[in-house]
Each structure stands twice: as structure tokens, then as C-alpha cells.
Regions:
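Generic alpha-helix detector with strongest preference for long hydrophobic helices that associate
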Residues: 8-12, 29, 63, 108, ...
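Substrate-binding rim/cap in mid-to-C-terminal beta-strand-loop elements of soluble/periplasmic
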Residues: 1-54
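C-terminal accessory region downstream of the catalytic core in glycan-modifying enzymes
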Residues: 32, 79-160
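C-terminal cap/loop subdomain of S1 sulfatases and analogous C-terminal strand-loop tails that border
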Residues: 33-110
Length: 160
């Protein structure tokens, strides 16, 4: 999203300004590499950026998932971003109904600006499978626990 990632200390190479996609989970591999620990364990999430000897990311994923709020997803490449927001709020079990979600693909410099929305089979073929894979575990397809929905007004101060 344009956030800065900076590491400074003994043994940290001076890389200057680097234009590379990173994710917050990359910090584990970055710090592990800089501290001299092995970073190839299969349980270790993240990516070592190319500037530190790893591989450049093709895309990053960020999301906002809080019960009582709409779900938001961004899948970003260097040049484009898929942005998604559900109409329904995230349920207390962490699932959400994606029916009617607003989805658009935009140039990175114009995210969420509808005048810049792109409709391209090539971009859809890249972004849609990645977004689907990411939300597969939280999509409830409109099926939810009825007792939980009945209790929602009490939990959220009268809001359905």
C-alpha cells in the first residue's frame, strides 16, 4: 500500500530506496536473514525480498476483517490493484457473505476511482483466482448460524 519498510543496524546492507512489493509477514524472513537464522522452514510465512537475495513478489494481499464491519480485500501488483468490499458485515465467526460484493480493478495510482476502473479479461484472469483462493475459508455463501444472527443486535447495540 505504499508503506515504508526500513531496517538499520550492524550488518544490514545499505540498499537505498527499493521499489519492491512487500507484506507485513515478510518481516520474519527479513529479520531472520539479517540475524543469520535459517529462513527456509516450511512453516515460516513470508517472502525474502529480492534486494536481500530472495525473489521479487508478483503480488501482495491485504485485508480488513472485523466482525460488524464490511470485509475489504486488496490484491496488488506493481501496476494494478483488485479492490473488493462486501455489502454484508463480517459475522462473529469470521465468515462473510460475498454475494453482491463490489469488486474493481484499477491502476495502482487510482485505486477505488471508478473513472479509472479497468475491465480486462487478462487482468481478471490474474486477479480473480488469487482473490478467490485467499477468501475461500471465510466465504460463508450466505449460510450462517441463526442463533448468532439473532444475538447480533444485543452484541452490536441494536444494529442488525
Amino acid at each position: 500500500t505504499g508503506g515504508a519498510l526500513m531496517a538499520r543496524g550492524a550488518g544490514v546492507p545499505a540498499c537505498g530506496r527499493v521499489d519492491e512489493l512487500t507484506s507485513t509477514v515478510d518481516i520474519y524472513k527479513i529479520l531472520g536473514k539479517l540475524a543469520g537464522y535459517p529462513i527456509d522452514a516450511p512453516y515460516l510465512d513470508g517472502n525474502l525480498p529480492e534486494v536481500l537475495g530472495g525473489q521479487r513478489r508478483a503480488y501482495t494481499v491485504s485485508n480488513s476483517i472485523y466482525p460488524g464491519q464490511t470485509y475489504k480485500l486488496a490484491v496488488r501488483t506493481h501496476d494494478h490493484a483488485l479492490r473488493l468490499e462486501t455489502q454484508e458485515k463480517v459475522d462473529e465467526d469470521g465468515t462473510v457473505d460475498f454475494a453482491g460484493a463490489r469488486v474493481g480493478i484499477y491502476p495502482r495510482a487510482h485505486e477505488l476511482e471508478e473513472d479509472y476502473a479497468l475491465d480486462s479479461a487478462e487482468l481478471r484472469a490474474f486477479f480473480y483466482p488469487r482473490a478467490r483462493d485467499f477468501v475461500r475459508e471465510i466465504a460463508n455463501n450466505g449460510e450462517f448460524w441463526p442463533a448468532m444472527r439473532a444475538a447480533r443486535p444485543e452484541w452490536f447495540g441494536g444494529q442488525p
